[in-house]
């Protein structure tokens, strides 16, 4: 069973293409025009063992908001398309990831019900040129279009770069756990309702 997808999103603000393989090895080609976002997408690919090819052109002459948000939206659409009817998946995933003084926890549920709880007390407003508030916009876009419930908590951290990086690494690892095929589930949908 192939769990690959390609999605394009074209608006007056951005042109986005995401191709992924949920059963990959972490290979990635990233060109969003936002270097820090490329760095974070690399964390998702490597720690989620997802092959990821993302290209984006956006109105970054204004700021990075539309590009970051729309990449999150398109990634969410691609994950939803690749995962299909969710038969046989584990459904839930979680991960704790440290980076020096920072520690983050991410928990995901492929419930079909979009919901985001994002609790990251950033210690500064920017990491280089990247506005840290855009990280919540990325995950909000992802959640709303992947149809997942996502809890993100930075439990401690002093360096804002470390705070964000632990979040993205933990997200990749939680995603990997949730989309794994459970051989004991025998292709059933992981819900007592029989649908997600």
Curated annotation (Swiss-Prot):
Keywords: Amino-acid biosynthesis, Cytoplasm, Histidine biosynthesis, Lyase. Transmembrane segments: none annotated. It catalyses: D-erythro-1-(imidazol-4-yl)glycerol 3-phosphate = 3-(imidazol-4-yl)-2-oxopropyl phosphate + H2O. It holds the Pfam family IGPD. One of its GO terms (molecular function) is imidazoleglycerol-phosphate dehydratase activity. Disulfide bonds: none annotated. PROSITE patterns: IGP_DEHYDRATASE_1, IGP_DEHYDRATASE_2. One of its GO terms (biological process) is L-histidine biosynthetic process. It is found in: Cytoplasm. Its EC number is 4.2.1.19. It is an enzyme of class 4 (lyase). One of its GO terms (cellular component) is cytoplasm. Its main location: cytoplasm. Pathway: Amino-acid biosynthesis; L-histidine biosynthesis; L-histidine from 5-phospho-alpha-D-ribose 1-diphosphate: step 6/9. Belongs to the imidazoleglycerol-phosphate dehydratase family. This is Imidazoleglycerol-phosphate dehydratase. The gene is hisB.
């Amino acid at each position: 069973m192939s769990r690959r997808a390609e999605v394009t999103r074209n608006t007056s603000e951005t042109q986005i293409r995401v191709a992924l393989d949920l059963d990959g090895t972490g290979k990635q080609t990233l060109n969003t025009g936002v270097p820090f976002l490329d760095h974070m997408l690399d964390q998702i690919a490597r720690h989620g063992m997802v092959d990821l090819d993302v290209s984006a052109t956006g109105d970054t002459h204004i700021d990075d908001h539309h590009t970051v948000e729309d990449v999150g939206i398109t990634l969410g659409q691609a994950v939803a398309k690749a995962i299909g009817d969710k038969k046989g998946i584990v459904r839930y995933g979680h991960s704790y990831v440290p980076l020096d003084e920072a520690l983050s926890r991410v928990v995901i549920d492929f419930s079909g019900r979009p919901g985001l709880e994002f609790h990251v007390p950033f210690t500064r407003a920017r990491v280089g040129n990247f506005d840290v508030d855009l990280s919540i916009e990325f995950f909000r876009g992802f959640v709303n279009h992947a149809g997942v419930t996502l809890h993100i908590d930075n439990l401690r951290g002093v360096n804002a770069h470390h705070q964000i990086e632990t979040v993205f690494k933990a997200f990749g690892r939680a995603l990997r756990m949730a989309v794994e095929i459970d051989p004991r589930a025998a292709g059933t949908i992981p819900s007592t309702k029989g649908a997600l």
